[in-house]
Amino acid sequence: MKNKIVFAPIGQGGGNIVDTLLGICGDYNALFINTSKKDLDSLKHAKHTYHIPYAEGCGKERKKAVGYAQTYYKQIIAQIMEKFSSCDIVIFVATMAGGTGSGITPPILGLAKQMYPNKHFGFVGVLPKATEDIDEHMNAIACWNDIMRSTNEGKDISIYLLDNNKREKESDINKEFATLFNDFMNMSESHAEGVVDEDEISKLLTMKKSNVILEFDDKEDIQVALAKSLKESIFAEYTTNTCEFMGISTTRVVDVEAIKSIVGYPRRTFKGYNSKKNIVVATGIEPQKTTVQMMNEIIEDKMKQRREVTSKSENMIIEPIALDDEDNKSVISSNEKEISIDNVEKEIDINDFFSKYM
C-alpha cells in the first residue's frame, strides 16, 4: 500500500511533517515543494525536491504564493504526476497559516484533481495555535475556503485536519501524525486471528471527506479510554456521530459497539488484530467546519485588543512651553539680522554647526 502513495508537502510546515514520516518509515514516496531553498536543504530525509524558480520564500503572504502557483503550476504538477506516475494516491500536506503551503496547495490540488480524475487525492492540513497572529488565522481560513471550493466542499478528497492547539510543540504534532499514519498503513501485518487487509486499508484511505486516526490503551474501560483518546487527539474536533467506513485493529477482543458509540457509527466496519497497538480509523466524517469557524472569534478578539491599545496610544504632538512676555518681547525686538541663503556659509561655520549633530 505504501508504494501506491506519493506525498506532496508544500512549504516548510508540510515538509517537516513528511520528513518526520520518512524518518519513521522510508518506504513512502514524496516530492517536497517549496519557495525557500533553505527550507528544502534543512530536510533530513528528502530524496526528491522542487524549488519554485527564483523564489526566496513568501513571508506568509498567500497572494504571493498563489502568484507562484499560477506561474509554475505546469512544472509543479508535472514534477509530482510524471515522476510518480505509478502512484494512485496523491496526498498534499501543508500548514494552513503560512504563505507557501497555504497559498500554493489549494489551486495545485484543484488543478491536479481535474487533470487526473482517476487518481485519488488527499490533504493533510494543520490549523494554527490560538496564540498565533491575526494574519496566520486569516491565512488558515482562506486556505480552508479555497480547499473547500476546489474539492466540492471536501467531498472529492480525503482530509486529515490537524490542530496545533492540541500539543505544546508543532514537532509533537508532526511526530504523532507520522506515527499514527504509519500504524494505519501497517494494520495488514500478519496475525493469527486475522487482520484489516490491504484492500480494506485502501478503502479506508480513499474514502472522501475527513478522516481521523486514534490509538487507545486497553488497560482501562474501553469507552473511557477512547473518549480520552478522542479528546486528546491531534485531529480537529468533529461534531457528527457518524462516519462511512471504520477500521479497527486491536491486540485482543474488544467491544466494537462501545468503540462505535464514542467514535461514530459507520456504514461499514473492517475488524482485525495486531500484536502492538489498538487502532481505530474513522473515515468519511463531515469536514470540521465548526472548528475552523471558531478562528473568526479568535481574530475578532485579537482585533479588539489592537483597537483598545490603539485608542490608548499617547498623543505624539508635544506642546511647546509658553515663553513669558519679556522673553517674547526680546525676541521680537531683536536687532539681529537675517542671513540669506546665499550668505549662510559666510556667516556660519557650517562644519562646526553640523559637528554638534554627529
Swiss-Prot record:
**Which residues make up the binding site for GTP?**
N182
The catalysed reaction is: GTP + H2O = GDP + phosphate + H(+)
A GO molecular-function annotation: GTP binding
- Calcium as a keyword of this entry, yes or no, is no
What's a BP term from Gene Ontology annotated to this protein? microtubule-based process
What keywords is this UniProt entry annotated with?
Answer: GTP-binding, Host cytoplasm, Hydrolase, Nucleotide-binding, Plasmid partition
Q: What is its main location?
A: host cell
The reply to whether Hydrolase figures as a keyword in the UniProt entry is yes
> What does the domain comment read?
Consists of two domains: a nucleotide-binding N-terminus that hydrolyzes GTP and a C-terminus domain necessary for polymerization. The domains are bridged by a long, central helix. The C-terminus is thought to insert into the most distant monomer of the plus end of the filament, forming the complete active site and modulating filament assembly.
| UniProt similarity note | Belongs to the FtsZ family. TubZ subfamily.
Q: What is this protein called?
A: Tubulin-like protein TubZ
Q: Which organism is it from?
A: Clostridium botulinum C phage
Q: Where does GDP bind?
A: Q12, G13, G14, G15, N16, T95, G99, T100, G101, E132, N164, E170, N174
Give the function comment from the record: A tubulin-like, filament forming GTPase; the motor component of the type III partition system presumably used to ensure correct segregation of this bacteriophage. In the presence of Mg(2+) and GTP (or GTP-gamma-S) assembles into filaments which upon polymerization are almost exclusively bound to GDP. Filament formation is cooperative, requiring a critical concentration. Formation occurs very quickly and is followed by disassembly as GTP is consumed. Unlike its plasmid homolog in B.thuringiensis (AC Q8KNP3) GTP-gamma-S does not alter filament formation.
Any extra detail in the entry?
A: This bacteriophage also exists as a circular plasmid prophage in its host.
Instruction: Indicate the enzyme's highest-level EC class.
Output: hydrolase
Output the SMART domains linked to this UniProt entry.
Tubulin
As for subcellular location, the record says: Host cytoplasm
The organism's superkingdom is given as Viruses
Q: What is its quaternary makeup? A: Monomer. In the presence of Mg(2+) and GTP assembles into 2-stranded filaments which coalesce into bundles. Binds a centromere-like site (tubC)-TubR complex. The TubZ-TubR-tubC complex bind to TubY which reshapes the filament bundles into rings. A later paper by the same group shows 4-stranded filament formation and suggests the 2-stranded form is a short-lived intermediate.
* EC numbers for this chain: 3.6.5.-
Q: Which gene encodes it?
A: tubZ
